[in-house]
Amino acid sequence: GEADYAVANTYYIALMLSGQKGAEQQAAAKKVKPLFPNQNGRGTHMNISGAGILKNSPNKANAIKLLEFLVTVEAQKHIVNNTFEYPIIEGVEPNKLISQFGLSFKQDLKTKVSAYYKNQAAALKLMTEAGWN
């Protein structure tokens, strides 16, 4: 469909721009101009990918090694270049498909995650009414 505005994660736009999803998706992504709201204020929400160790994990030593590896430059470069997500450590730049947007990104560190949950039912209702599935 067509729209003047859309909400999307930057990694989806970068994936489309990469051509991995085909020429049609790449052409569509080239018509999009990303923007991050609230950059002069609180910043913009950022999704995170997290990892942890279960209390009853039978192999805590190797779990710790995995977590430590995931925050190395090597692992972060792999993540950045294969998922188009933002790096979690300083010194690793976002993928060039993200950087080419020419935008700085200020993350919203003020809004508690629980605030998003409070609005989940209303957001789901709006999406359903709009025909999103």
Residue ranges of each PLM-predicted region?
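Solvent-exposed loop/turn segments at secondary-structure junctions
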Residues: 10-14, 39-42, 58, 72, ...
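Mature extracytoplasmic/periplasmic domains
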Residues: 49-111
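Solvent-exposed, acidic/flexible segments
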Residues: 6, 43, 59-63, 72, ...
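Ligand-binding pocket segment of bilobal, Venus flytrap-like solute-binding proteins
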Residues: 1-37
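Extracellular/periplasmic bilobal clamshell ligand-binding domains
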Residues: 96-133
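Periplasmic-binding protein-like
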Residues: 27-55
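Structured segments of extracytoplasmic/periplasmic soluble domains
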Residues: 1, 16-19, 56, 69-76, ...
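Broad hydrophobic/π-residue packing in well-ordered secondary structure
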Residues: 9, 13, 35-36, 51, ...
